[in-house]
Amino acid sequence: MAFSASALSVKTLGALLLVAADLLSAQTAPTHGVRPRRLAIRGAMVVEGNATPAEGPKDIIIEGNRIVQIVSLDPAAIRNGTARRPPADVEIDASGKYVGPGLINLHGHVQDERAGLAQPLEYQFKLWLGMGITTVRDVSSETPKTLQLRARSLAGEVMAPRFYVYARYAYMPVPRNEAEARQRVRDLKAQGVDGLKLFGMDKDVYGPVLDEARKQGLRVAHHMAVDETNALDAAANGLTSLEHWYGVPDAAIPDGVQHFPSNFNYADEGMRFRLAGRLWREADPAKLQDVLKAMVKGGVAWNPTLDIYEASRDLQRAETQPWYGEYLHPTLEKFFRPDPSNHGSYFANWSSTDEAFWKENYRIWFGAVRDFERLGGVIGAGEDAGFIYQVYGFGLIRELELHQEAGFPTLKVLQHATANNALILGQQENLGRVRPGYLADLVILNGNPLEDLKVFYPPRADAAAGPGGGVAWTIKDGIPYDAQRLLREVRELVSTAKRSSSR
């Protein structure tokens, strides 16, 4: 059968158009780990990060490492091909996907070893990026190493989130008077840190440390111990953020100190955390409200890290998390086993009675956190992973679920991990929102996080809710990362490490 010239030309033209379309698609597809000159995220539903409702479809245009334009689109115009779309060199099709600010982890620890065993930083960083975490406030890791990582991350030399380095204040010798305390703050400032991390504090040096930090332009995170200082001292002296919950219920106990048994030893972590589960019940409700109001008035933000103590209320859940098989590195697995030499591994002889007290603890704690925000306080979100059965990245997503359990609307939960965390960092003009002029730190999700926060977790074929969800792309500083590729590489890394450790 002979073909006519006109038929042949039409078929040839059609084939050429298909080839051209394939070439165009190949030219505009993002390259993992490479920042394009101009990137478009097409047709996304956008959750801005400021607790306003999702809106879309929208095109988000990025030039270099900044968002430069966000265009609202008419769905009908998209369907009939008449929508005016801003041009770009590279495109990500986000149709049916949700885009939000990259998550900020306000309480992270860069860890290259656990339980005396080396642990690759690649494992930690890829988990963070793979679950949409683009910024980490590192609180008291090895400062010189973390400062180097901060610089390398900003330069795009390492596949990692951006870091804000909060150095440990109380390294040896610990300052014992005002002059030494102020000098320590100045010394840390000279190293180039972004802030300070405090553990416990004596009253006579607490005020001078926070005063000197303000003079040096340093923000301060405080993990309070059972010590002289509490949340009222933080409020009076202008602390930036109170970590965990230490110091809040303590300040509301009528007698000024928890009713410890006579044999209590604070250095015994099993005893310490067992009694911590009985603390919130001793706080006077009316006095607790006064403490929360004082924190709000003093401008103290609260980063509760609800996730890191959850094993205390349900140990079996913590020990059997479904992603452990593929994502738990052998070094972490060893560190998590009950062992008094490993901080937070205190679960020898943990009982149902301990869990019952901790469940009550959480109920009161949830209420205090909710009241704090309703009074005008700023709530942040951080994971403190690498301890107490929490794996990097997974810990922050669990933190968001616990904020939801505490009663916060999901829009507010996401605000805690984005715009609020940026505010606590002093980066509210650069981070935490999907907005023109802001840094291009974004997460593109295969699902609606307002319906189910579990879309941040890696997809699982055997999940009861089905295999959907997961982060499609994480964009940090304008660099797109294929999140599922990162997580696949983590699984391979863990599998290799397990084989090596079993030899």
Task: Identify the function of each model-found stretch.
Residues Q124-P144, A160-R168, K189-M201, L210, ...:
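Divalent metal-dependent hydrolysis catalytic cores, especially in the metallo-beta-lactamase
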Residues A20-A21:
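N-terminal signal peptide c-region/cleavage motif recognized by signal peptidases
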Residues A29-R37, V46, N50-G100:
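Histidine-rich, glycine-flanked metal-binding segment
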Residues R84-D89, A94-E157, P173-A179, L232-G247, ...:
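Metal-associated gating/positioning segment near the N- to mid-region
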Residues L188-D194, V248-A406, V494-R503:
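Active-site neighborhoods of metal-dependent hydrolases
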Residues L439-V494:
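C-terminal cap of metal-dependent C-N hydrolases
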Residues A44, A348-F357, Y362, G367, ...:
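C-terminal helical cap
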Residues R168-Q216, F264-E282:
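Active-site gating/metal-coordination segments in enzymes
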